[in-house]
């Protein structure tokens, strides 16, 4: 004779099966989920050149003695100054990260001509592009790639 299952166990089992079919774990249903990125952090070497470059792109910034926060919409990039990332006591970082270690993609809302003009004024040499790419929005766009003064790879994607 099969063992009797409590109603609570049965309901949890059915919820888990339904969640698995729907692609979401029971833990995610019960306790929350990751909703997106808040910020990324990168070490920077050429501080003044980096500040001028990202200001030239039009990003608002907040400077502190150890970190420069560059705001991109509702997210930010924290650039760690050399005084921070070269300090052996600072451990809340990727231990082997040194400039250039970033590969970032920005969404450009404007024409390809306006982007090319801005990049030329910085100046930022286009390394590749325009090329068709699949972006984080799960649809195609046209991208160009440049490097910032530290050598981090920056992609600018224009969604169709």
Regions found by a protein language model. Give the residues of each.
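Core segments of cupin and vicinal oxygen chelate
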Residues: 42-86
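Residues that flank catalytic or metal-binding motifs in active/ligand-binding sites
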Residues: 36, 66, 73-75, 100-102, ...
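Short beta->alpha transition motifs characteristic of CBS
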Residues: 82, 157-160
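N-terminal beta-strand motif that seeds the catalytic metal site of vicinal oxygen chelate
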Residues: 21-48, 102-104, 160
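Vicinal oxygen chelate
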Residues: 44-49, 99, 103-150
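N-terminal secretory signal peptides and thylakoid transit peptides that target proteins
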Residues: 1-18
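Short beta-strand/turn micro-motifs at beta-sheet edges
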Residues: 28-30, 89-93
